[in-house]
A protein has these predicted regions:
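Extracytoplasmic beta-rich repeat domains
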Residues: 1-15, 40-64, 88-104, 128-145, ...
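WD40 beta-propeller blade core
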Residues: 28, 79, 117-118, 158
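Short loop/turn segments that connect beta-strands within beta-propeller blades
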Residues: 31-35, 82-85, 120-123, 161-165
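Conserved mixed alpha/beta catalytic, RNA-binding, or beta-rich assembly cores of soluble enzyme
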Residues: 104-110
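C-terminal closing repeat unit and adjoining cap/tail of repeat-based domains
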Residues: 123, 147, 152-188
């Protein structure tokens, strides 16, 4: 495309394939051994009357649990995809600039309006949604122990219960905005 969103997500390796999202809305696989192309699937098709409306980038890093991939596109598609075949397992509307996190039960996404949403990893059904940080420009989420952790534009780090979505704690990490998903190191 002639116009794309600034940034790019990291590729992931699942078994013997490399998988990445691209600025044309496609998710594609390549053989790790020789780079030969495998499957590709259009997850976030461009639509609209002008270049801005047709932005369809997949800039968030693809997340994996076992053989399942989870990816969110700029225009608003959150999808679960089978790594070996590229077959869509489920898809939901979820516009995000910041990405997502995954644990054994749920997929967590920081929405474009700073809402935090949990979807069932298996079915894609909404488990909970919390809008207490609306318009606080939250970072991408991190799944940590029994919490989902995000930062915000004032330097606060917020901890939510991963099962219920209730706010558990808030700490000031500094005066600067938190722009990246919080990093979990071991049990800290």
């Amino acid at each position: 495309p002639r116009l794309s969103v600034r940034g790019t997500g990291a590729a992931v390796v699942v078994k013997d394939i490399v998988i990445g999202g691209f600025d044309n809305g496609k998710l594609a696989s390549y053989a790790l051994a020789d780079g030969s192309p495998g499957w590709d699937v259009l997850l976030d098709p461009p639509a609209g009357r002008n270049e801005i409306e047709r932005l369809s980038d997949i800039n968030a890093t693809v997340r994996t649990i076992g053989d399942d991939l989870y990816v969110v596109g700029y225009r608003g598609q959150l999808s679960a995809v089978a790594a070996e075949s590229g077959q869509a397992l489920w898809s939901q509307d979820a516009r995000s600039y910041e990405g997502l996190a995954v644990d054994l039960q749920n997929v967590y996404v920081s929405g474009a309006g700073s809402e935090l949403t949990a979807l069932s990893r298996v079915s894609g059904a909404e488990v909970w949604k919390n809008e207490v940080l609306k318009n606080r420009d939250i970072s991408g989420p991190t799944a940590w122990q029994n919490s989902v952790v995000v930062g915000d534009f004032e330097g606060y780090v917020h901890f939510f219960d991963s099962a219920t979505g209730e706010l558990q704690a808030r700490v000031r990490a500094g005066g600067d905005r938190v722009t990246s998903p919080p990093l979990a190191l071991n049990d800290m």
